[in-house]
């Protein structure tokens, strides 16, 4: 009974955290917030890197710090409180405090508001990195193997429902004004506080790694030892995950290509793609989660294989110029299948990272992997943006090659349940 209670408390906390992620989308809410305060347009380009890679890059350093510590509850609570403070700063200072201090129409007020939003987002991402690391250990210590994928699946399904609700709310609101932004801020703060209350009494201790003597090891030996950890299980996981990042990277290029193919069609719209993605999450997440509990590596492979097959079909359509002869609904269905595949790769990756190591080793493993992937996402994003002029055929070809390479080397990955 205790295990069931802990399981559902963790699920509720994950759902609330995912709700906050949805509400603080770098594609909708945050650009609208910058626009509402009149911030310079160049700041828009910093939102996604700060929001996504900003929460991944510091995890290796954080993991190294956590490695010699056994308590995970206090760092998690501290990071959640910090996130709440940065959310409050991000919305309340520019929308409520600054208008009383300066002329809201002034350039200086707009610039300062923009910098406060970006600084708060940076702090939020750093705090989120610690939350992510410690939550993995909370899941790993309180949920046995065979239950973790189920938890991820349930939380993702609920997040899919919430994303549909939020998308519908956004679509029916022709403008996201300051009042709605403040409601979103209030919703995020409520979700964070409730999540803290749900898990604050769940004590989590892991076996600290105190084998190495930090005082007698030279800096050179420390660097060599650190580099050597990027081998074996971790090396294959990072390499495969770097290839499978294409399951997510393909989405924006596919959407833009579809919108350009049918620019005047109301069915092929951003709202349709958001609904397709949310529906895919609802339909597939629980199934992927259950499969991950059986074999997380296989789940990653199947998800990536689905996206690879869609990539090949897209290449055929582009090469023979079939796009205009296809019914518009086929683009939405295609994106639905892409989203199903991405959910599989994502679910398998999460459970694999939880199951392959234990205790402080898990913290170190996940931290280094996430930092590496943060760098990979930035580099691939810059690379694909730089070669976008080459056309969709070249882009999708490179992504298909990346997925194929990842599928081949994924068989070198150690089975996490063995």
Positions of the model-derived regions?
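Transmembrane alpha-helix termini and helix-breaking/packing motifs in multi-pass membrane transporters
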Residues: 31-36, 63-68, 94-100, 160-184, ...
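C-terminal transmembrane helical hairpin of 12-TM major facilitator-type secondary transporters
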Residues: 298-345
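Helix-to-loop junctions at the C-terminal end of transmembrane segments
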Residues: 58-71, 174, 284-297, 388
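Juxtamembrane intracellular "pre-TM" segments in multi-pass secondary transporters
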Residues: 1-4, 205-240
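Intracellular juxtamembrane helix-capping segments at the cytosolic ends
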Residues: 128-143, 343-357
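Helix-loop boundary and gating motifs at the non-cytosolic
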Residues: 1-57, 66, 91, 233-273
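C-terminal ends and interior cores of transmembrane alpha-helices
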Residues: 81-110, 306-324
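Cytoplasmic membrane-interface "Motif A"-like loop-to-helix N-cap segments
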Residues: 67-84, 293-308
């Amino acid at each position: 009974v205790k295990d069931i209670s802990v399981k559902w408390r963790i699920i509720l906390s994950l759902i609330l955290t995912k709700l906050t992620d949805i509400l603080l989308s770098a594609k909708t809410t945050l650009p609208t917030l910058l626009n509402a305060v009149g911030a310079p347009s160049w700041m828009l380009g910093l939102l996604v890197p700060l929001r996504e890679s900003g929460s991944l890059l510091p995890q290796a350093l954080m993991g190294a710090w956590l490695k010699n510590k056994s308590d995970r509850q206090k760092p998690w609570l501290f990071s959640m409180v910090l996130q709440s403070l940065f959310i409050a700063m991000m919305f309340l200072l520019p929308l409520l405090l600054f208008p009383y201090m300066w002329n809201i129409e002034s350039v200086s007020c707009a610039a300062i508001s923009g910098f406060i939003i970006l600084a708060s987002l940076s702090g939020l991402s750093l705090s989120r990195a610690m939350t992510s690391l410690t939550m993995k250990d909370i899941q790993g210590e309180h949920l046995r193997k065979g239950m973790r994928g189920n938890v991820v699946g349930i939380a993702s399904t609920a997040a899919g429902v919430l994303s549909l609700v939020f998308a519908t709310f956004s679509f029916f609101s022709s403008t996201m004004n300051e009042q709605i932004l403040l409601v979103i801020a209030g919703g995020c703060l409520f979700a964070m506080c409730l999540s803290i209350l749900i898990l604050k009494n769940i004590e989590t201790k892991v076996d600290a790694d105190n084998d190495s003597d930090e005082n007698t090891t030279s800096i050179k030996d420390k660097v060599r030892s650190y580099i050597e950890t990027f081998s074996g299980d971790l090396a294959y996981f990072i390499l495969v995950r770097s290839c499978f990042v294409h399951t997510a990277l393909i989405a924006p290029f596919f959407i833009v290509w579809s919108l350009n193919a049918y620019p005047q069609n109301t069915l092929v719209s951003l709202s349709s793609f958001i609904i397709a993605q949310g529906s895919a999450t609802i339909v597939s997440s629980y199934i992927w989660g259950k499969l991950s509990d059986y074999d997380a590596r296989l789940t990653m492979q199947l998800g990536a294989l689905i996206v690879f097959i869609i990539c090949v079909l897209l290449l055929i359509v582009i090469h023979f110029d079939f796009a205009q002869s296809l019914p518009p609904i086929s683009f939405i269905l295609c994106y639905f299948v892409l989203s199903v595949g991405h959910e599989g790769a994502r679910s398998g990756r999460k459970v694999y990272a939880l199951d392959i190591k234990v205790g402080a080793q898990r913290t170190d493993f996940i931290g280094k992997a996430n930092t590496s992937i943060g760098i990979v996402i930035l580099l691939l994003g810059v690379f694909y943006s730089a070669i976008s002029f080459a056309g969709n055929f070249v882009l999708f070809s490179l992504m298909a090659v990346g997925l194929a390479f990842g599928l081949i080397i994924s068989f070198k990955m150690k089975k996490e349940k063995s």
